[in-house]
């Protein structure tokens, strides 16, 4: 099938005097375009994940670069076959990355290109730090990277404190990376505040590395926050051996699902055989739960939508009404 949609990942830190106006302009523009997205705008700038029919995506990129303050936005593009978000979401978020503390964005690590990053990996001189959540690096990461056991962005400040106690900040050079680069903009500042003298950040994140270098020193797949959930970092190299395993049978696997049990919704890795036997659930206990969303093999591992929650509620109400009649 011809891939005629684009997936765009981008962010830009810049002063935005009227975020609500930018949000309104985005929403108005998208009314007539075949797109879906999750875009956050604040006084700090913009953080966007977007998908759209190729001509509409190109129109949006040109439009945004013509907006005051956004002329230098860099878009990372993947070719896809359909929209990958459930709806158009453009909203205000005070923190573009939900860190929970203030950081000095004027004091950041040194941005290095994917090529420079690869060369430094070859040197094996620095501590390579994955600053993503644990469920992200579980299915893919750089060779020999330090993998913090954190599940939310807000846990990183405490981890930065821990890191400064485990390694001498004055003599430990750090190379940090994330999916697209925006988390490193904040996290590098935190490490500098903790006394680390030499902090590098991968410009454009893992996405840019995959596009510029290829698989290189990367192992596994890249977790993404959209319907795909996991992708190879090199579009030309899709035969990627899994580095994770099924949570039920430990078969090598890197496919994520969210639990069909409405009251769980846990994100878990599962093979094709086990996902069927457990009715799309993360455990046998969840497979016996009263509010299970219907799982069909044809839907693949696409995350459940809110409408499934509505369907479960409706079925429960209808069942209750039926009981009352007898």
UniProtKB/Swiss-Prot annotation:
CDD domains: RHOD_YceA (cd01518). Residues 122-218 form the Rhodanese domain. The active site is at 178 (cysteine persulfide intermediate). It is an enzyme of class 1 (oxidoreductase). Keywords: Oxidoreductase, tRNA processing. Its EC number is 1.14.-.-. One of its GO terms (molecular function) is oxidoreductase activity, acting on paired donors, with incorporation or reduction of molecular oxygen. It catalyses: uridine(34) in tRNA + AH2 + O2 = 5-hydroxyuridine(34) in tRNA + A + H2O. It holds the Pfam family Rhodanese_C. The keyword Hydrolase does not apply. It comes from the Bacteria. GO terms for biological process: tRNA modification. Belongs to the TrhO family. Catalyzes oxygen-dependent 5-hydroxyuridine (ho5U) modification at position 34 in tRNAs. PANTHER family: RHODANESE-LIKE DOMAIN-CONTAINING PROTEIN 7-RELATED (PTHR43268:SF3), THIOSULFATE SULFURTRANSFERASE/RHODANESE-LIKE DOMAIN-CONTAINING PROTEIN 2 (PTHR43268). NCBIfam families: PRK00142.1-2, PRK00142.1-3. This is tRNA uridine(34) hydroxylase. It comes from Chlamydia abortus (strain DSM 27085 / S26/3). The gene is trhO.
């Amino acid at each position: 099938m011809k891939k005629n949609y684009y997936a765009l990942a981008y962010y830009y830190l810049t002063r935005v005097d009227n975020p609500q106006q930018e949000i309104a302009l985005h929403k108005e523009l998208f009314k007539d375009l075949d797109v879906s997205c999750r875009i956050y705008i604040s006084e700090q700038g913009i953080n966007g994940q977007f998908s759209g029919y190729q001509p509409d995506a190109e129109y949006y990129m040109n439009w945004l670069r013509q907006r005051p303050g956004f002329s230098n936005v860099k878009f990372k593009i993947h070719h896809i076959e359909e929209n990958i978000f459930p709806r158009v979401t453009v909203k205000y978020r005070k923190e573009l990355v939900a860190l929970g503390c203030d950081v000095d964005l004027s004091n950041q690590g040194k941005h290095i290109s994917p090529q420079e990053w690869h060369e430094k990996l070859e040197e094996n001189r620095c501590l390579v730090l994955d600053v993503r959540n644990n469920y992200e690096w579980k299915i893919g990461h750089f060779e020999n990277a330090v993998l913090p056991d954190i599940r939310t962005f807000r846990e990183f400040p405490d981890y930065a404190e821990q890191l400064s106690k485990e390694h001498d900040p004055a003599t430990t050079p750090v190379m940090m990376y994330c999916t697209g680069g925006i988390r490193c903009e904040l996290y590098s500042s935190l490490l500098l505040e903790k006394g680390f003298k030499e902090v590098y950040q991968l410009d454009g994140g893992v996405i840019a590395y995959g596009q510029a270098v290829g698989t290189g020193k990367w192992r596994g797949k890249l977790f993404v926050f959209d319907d795909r959930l996991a992708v190879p970092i090199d579009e030309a190299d899709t035969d990627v051996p899994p580095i994770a395993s099924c949570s039920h049978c430990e078969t090598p696997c890197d496919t994520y699902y969210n639990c069909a049990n409405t009251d769980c919704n846990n994100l878990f890795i599962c093979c094709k055989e086990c996902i069927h036997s457990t009715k799309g659930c993360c455990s046998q206990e969840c497979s016996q739960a009263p509010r299970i969303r219907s799982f069909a093999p044809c839907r693949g591992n696409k995350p459940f939508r809110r409408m499934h929650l509505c369907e479960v509620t409706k079925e429960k109400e209808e069942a209750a009404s039926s009981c009352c009649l007898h």
